[in-house]
């Protein structure tokens, strides 16, 4: 990894009515990181989100959960990245992923938005730069395109949620490896993991 990660963003929608919905998987990951590394997240209107700072393997990392709605996530990410002069290549964005089953999570750098409105807005607000890293947290697919909105905005059944939580825990552990500057090792660990019921 040439550029060390300086900012980790967890995507979701604000408010208690969305807190436990599948679309907030990215936000759960950042909250888990804050907890594991004894950080705290606080509302920061300047960056339109909850922000915090932690240290992972001696490296200083900023955390951000945008409090804008999902399709406006770029506003928050760019505000913070611009202020601290963090290039896209040093940003990791965690998000829910329809194309992976619950219990699976994968790191990736660059690529399109795959129809994800949060990623779409971030790419757009970064001036069409898609070179940031992603953590894709599998939530599964409802089967048809028409069902997607209702699916991501509802809670997963208990058994599915357990799989998502297990993959989240593994992603947090793999993040530790990521900060030894070994993306390949972190990917190998996370990509070989699949939670089972």
UniProtKB/Swiss-Prot annotation:
The keyword RNA-binding belongs to this UniProt entry's keyword annotation: yes
Positions annotated to bind tRNA: 18, 69, 71, 117
Site features described as Stabilizes the basic form of H active site to accept a proton, chain residue numbers: 96
Annotated site residues (Discriminates between blocked and unblocked aminoacyl-tRNA) in this chain: 13
First-listed, main subcellular location of the protein, grouped into a coarse class: cytoplasm
Active site positions: 23
Broad class of enzyme this protein falls into: hydrolase
E.C. designation(s): 3.1.1.29
GO molecular function: peptidyl-tRNA hydrolase activity; tRNA binding
UniProt xrefs under SUPFAM superfamilies: Peptidyl-tRNA hydrolase-like
Annotated localization: Cytoplasm
InterPro entries from the UniProt entry: Pept_tRNA_hydro, Pept_tRNA_hydro_CS, Pept_tRNA_hydro_sf
Span of the signal peptide: none
Catalysed reactions, as listed in the record: an N-acyl-L-alpha-aminoacyl-tRNA + H2O = an N-acyl-L-amino acid + a tRNA + H(+)
GO cellular component, one term: cytoplasm
Keywords tagged on the record: Cytoplasm, Hydrolase, RNA-binding, tRNA-binding
GO biological process, one term: rescue of stalled ribosome
Oligomer and partners: Monomer.
UniProt family annotation: Belongs to the PTH family.
Xref: HAMAP family: Pept_tRNA_hydro_bact (MF_00083)
Main function: Hydrolyzes ribosome-free peptidyl-tRNAs (with 1 or more amino acids incorporated), which drop off the ribosome during protein synthesis, or as a result of ribosome stalling.
Protein name per UniProt: Peptidyl-tRNA hydrolase
């Amino acid at each position: 990894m040439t550029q060390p990660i300086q900012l980790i963003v967890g995507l979701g929608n604000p408010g208690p009515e969305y807190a436990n919905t599948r679309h907030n998987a990215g936000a759960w990951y950042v909250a888990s990181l804050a907890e594991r590394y004894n950080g705290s997240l606080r509302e920061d209107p300047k960056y339109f989100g909850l922000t915090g700072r932690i240290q992972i393997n001696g490296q200083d990392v900023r955390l951000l959960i945008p409090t804008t709605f999902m399709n406006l996530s770029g506003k928050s990410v760019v505000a913070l990245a611009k202020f601290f002069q963090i290039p896209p290549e040093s940003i990791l964005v965690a998000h829910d992923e329809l194309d992976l089953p619950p219990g699976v999570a994968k790191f990736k750098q660059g690529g399109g938005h795959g129809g994800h409105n949060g990623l779409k807005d971030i790419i757009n607000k970064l001036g069409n730069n898609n070179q940031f890293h992603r953590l894709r947290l599998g939530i599964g697919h409802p089967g048809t395109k028409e069902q997607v909105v209702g699916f991501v905005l509802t809670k997963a059944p208990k058994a599915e949620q357990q799989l998502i939580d297990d993959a989240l825990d593994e992603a947090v552990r793999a993040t530790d490896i990521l900060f030894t500057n070994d993306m390949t090792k972190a990917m190998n660990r996370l990509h070989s993991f699949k939670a089972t019921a």
